[in-house]
Amino acid sequence: MADIKNLNPVEIWRNFDKLTQVPRPSGHLEKIQAYLLDWAKEAGVEAFQDPAGNIVMRKPATPGMENRKGVIMQAHMDMVPQKAPDSKHNFETDPIETIIDGDWVRANHTTLGSDDGLGVATIMAVMESKDLQHGPIEGLITADEETGMYGANDLPASELNGDILLNFDTEVWGEFVIGSAGGIDITATLDYKEVETDKEDAAVKVTLKGLKGGHSGIEINEGRANANKCMVRFVREAISELDARLASWQGGNMRNAIPFQAEVVLTLPKENIEALNDLVADWKDEICDEFEGIETTENIEFFAENVETPKMQVPAEIQDNLVDAIYACHDGVLRMAPSMPEIVETSSNLAIVEIGDGKAAIKILARSSHEYYKMYLATMVESCFNMAGMKVEFSGSYMGWNPNPKSDILEHVLKVYKEQNGTDGKVQAVHAGLECSIILSKYPNLDVVSFGPTLLSPHTANERCQISCVAPFWNLVKQLLTEIPAK
């Protein structure tokens, strides 16, 4: 494990190093919540955990600066638990192994947790600082952002006192985000009675892996391969041409990550095994050709292996309905923003497919900066799975964050950034969910901007943070806090 705690600036890297030692996958935050409260107590920082599981910290103003506008620094404590297929890492018990790789910090075949651990570490650095001059400060460290922004959604509307919100969950240094997409989770489920497999049939497990995956908002415009959408094309042809039957399907494991792996178990007449192997080879070539220049095609694996024939499988009619619905379900970009053609407005990610043992569950995350198109796409997906006889539920819906280009804090941030770096910052809206939109719905008078150091490939085992961006990011935060104007 690389010693990252002595990287510059040590104030941030020392705290991030501590965070990597505390397991904090979404949905399992007890250890990190306890750690943050213990850390605050030891540092002499006022802190409490609210009913939503968020940690709130408060630091009084430097004497003489009590009249300054209050600043809320915000980041989320949870991380996406993604790992390479051969990794044995247990996100609920194991620390993250960090590696310094040139100008980057990465993990050992797992997500790093810089999204949004570096934001949390920055809040900690400000809170423990003894020489930073500032007005009244609050730190809001939210729970379960990655799985549905639950901490922000359940944030009490009277908990915070600040006037300005600095969100540290943007992943390109020099970009200052003032708008983001809304989102909605769509879950389609079906219980079915399995039928017996023909005792004379053979069985194969077909696996697709080695795709890039990635963030289903930020990277959806790159046209990366979705393992579930690739697999369904193969499965439909195997059923149609080789009398294959579906026994089980497992593809994807995170609602907000493009699935990079999927596997199915198929049964079929023994005499069709050789033809199935040929079909697998053909589809591997097709996928590599289709995604040449987008995926790292030499990493793509698509193969079949003989397995014990399962006793039960999906009934033929239900199988056909499920496969058709997955095939037809929209995935990827639906519409670009008319006013900003380089920005995705509306998209969806066919994130998770789980079929087997008499149950089917399919999960999609739809995003849009336009509320109408968000619900239009969600209803389109709902209609698709309704036709397959599935029960469809919407959850976790949140509005987008409408840009305010005349924001006072944006103007100040851009001024300080140019003073420090000699170049203009880029004002941006992102096709991803940021908690800013939800917090603004509860605190509508906040002036908000989001920024952070450069991260690459978040939500994947290739996640990494650029070391050289962290020092200028820290310098910007410190000067901003020192120069916040009076109320």
Enumerate the predicted regions with their spans.
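Active-site metal-coordination/substrate-binding segment of hydrolases
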Residues: 65-163, 189, 203, 327-337, ...
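Zn-dependent metallopeptidase/amidohydrolase metal-coordination segment
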Residues: 4, 9-12, 338-341, 345-360, ...
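Midchain, well-structured core segments that form catalytic/ion-binding scaffolds
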Residues: 23, 103-106, 146-147, 153-367
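Active-site-adjacent substrate-binding region
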Residues: 219, 226-228, 233-249, 403-446
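Substrate-recognition/cap regions that form aromatic- and gly/pro-loop-enriched pockets
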Residues: 343-432
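Short secondary-structure junctions
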Residues: 40-46, 237-245, 292-296, 343, ...
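Acidic/His- and Gly-rich active-site-bordering loop/insert found
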Residues: 3-103
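His/Asp/Glu-rich mid-to-C-terminal helical/loop segments that flank catalytic regions of hydrolases
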Residues: 158, 223-241, 268-273, 320-327, ...
